[in-house]
Design a protein with these regions (language model features):
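Donor-binding and catalytic core of enzymes assembling or modifying cell-surface/extracellular glycoconjugates
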Residues: 19, 186-270
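Secretory-pathway luminal glycosyltransferase catalytic domains
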Residues: 52-187
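A short, glycine/small-residue-rich beta-strand->loop->alpha-helix junction that serves as a flexible
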Residues: 14-24, 169-171
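Short, charged/polar "capping" segments at the starts of alpha-helices
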Residues: 51-56, 169-171, 197-203, 276-277
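Gly/Pro- and small hydrophobic-enriched strand-loop and loop-to-helix capping segments
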Residues: 35-49, 259-283
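Histidine-anchored nucleotide/phosphate-binding helix
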Residues: 22-37, 174-183
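Nucleotide-activated donor-dependent transferases that construct or modify glycoconjugates
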Residues: 2-17
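Short His-Asn-centered micro-motif
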Residues: 13-15, 47-50, 163-164, 192-196, ...
């Protein structure tokens, strides 16, 4: 006979505005929920309104978001992620309502890792990210438009996405080296995903100036559509080949490359600390 689950307990976590970091947080909470269920404890994820969760777009209708008074009435016990990570099993057997803090965008944050994210957790994250049909259609048609831009016979194998942000490390040689690797694979059609197109043009157009002829064809993805940040995140996950941003405070392209459905993909990163099984090159 199965033991009935105890009363519902709530769990929440401190977020920042980066979708990639939010996915690390959500994956961590799913892991806790799974372990709690094995201890016959039913636990539910909730967020305080204003906690940066994208509940009106990419995560629309997926999580309970409460106003301050309703959230505070649940009586959360605040726990540092550093304390939880030392003894996560104790939390998973607790019936208290827990709010996790100290989840800064930092490589020292124990949440920021793919080590514990197994295939069931990955599938659940995919379901969450791809649940908004409006964003999915927008990203899909953008991807088809990119293929069309590069030519009628262009395939998924022939293009790569490059994620570059204005707040990136000034080590732009990383991008030059990453593009050289793509060039060695005869991938010269590059979709540039950036938060500042004009700035990115000044950085990346120099790449072609280094060569006698224009080696790469660059397509700059528009930032004009509604919910462009969320749509661009989903768009990145549709690419087989991806050059991850070298911005340590942004995990979007790292997560997009992880979620991409392709098995044999080319994923290049500058981060030696946060890696997943699909990464092929660390520069």
């Amino acid at each position: 006979m199965k033991r009935a689950l105890r009363q519902t307990c709530y769990i929440s976590i401190e977020n920042n505005e980066n979708i990639g970091y939010q996915l690390f947080n959500i994956a961590y909470l799913i892991n806790i929920l799974n372990k709690s269920t094995r201890n016959h404890i039913k636990r539910k994820i909730v967020f305080r309104k204003g906690n940066h969760i994208y509940s009106d777009s990419i995560f629309k209708g997926l999580f309970t978001v409460l106003d301050d008074d309703k959230y505070d009435n649940l009586g959360f016990e605040k726990m540092s992620i550093n304390d939880i990570d030392i003894d996560i099993e104790s939390l998973c057997s607790s019936t208290k309502n827990i709010e996790i803090y100290n989840t800064s965008a930092d490589t020292r944050n124990p949440i920021v890792t793919f080590k514990y994210i197994d295939e069931p957790i990955k599938r659940r994250i995919l379901e969450l990210v791809y649940s908004n049909e409006d964003l999915m259609y927008s990203a899909y048609y953008m991807y088809r438009g990119i293929l069309a831009f590069f030519g009628e016979n262009t395939s998924d194998d022939d293009i790569a996405a490059l994620h570059i942000l204005k707040a990136d490390s000034k080590d732009y040689d990383y991008y030059y080296d990453a593009l050289s690797i793509m060039n060695d694979l005869k991938i010269q059609n590059i979709a540039v995903i950036t938060d500042d197109i004009e700035w990115a043009k000044t950085i990346l157009n120099d790449i072609n100036d280094i060569n006698d002829t224009s080696t790469y064809t660059l397509y700059y993805v528009s930032n004009a559509e509604k919910n462009n940040y969320e749509t661009r995140f989903i768009l990145m996950s549709m690419f087989k080949n991806l050059i991850v941003s070298n911005n340590a405070s942004d995990m979007d392209s790292m997560w997009a490359s992880y979620l991409s459905y392709y098995d044999n993909k080319k994923v290049i990163t500058a981060d030696k600390n946060i890696i997943h099984k699909y990464i092929t090159d660390i520069l």
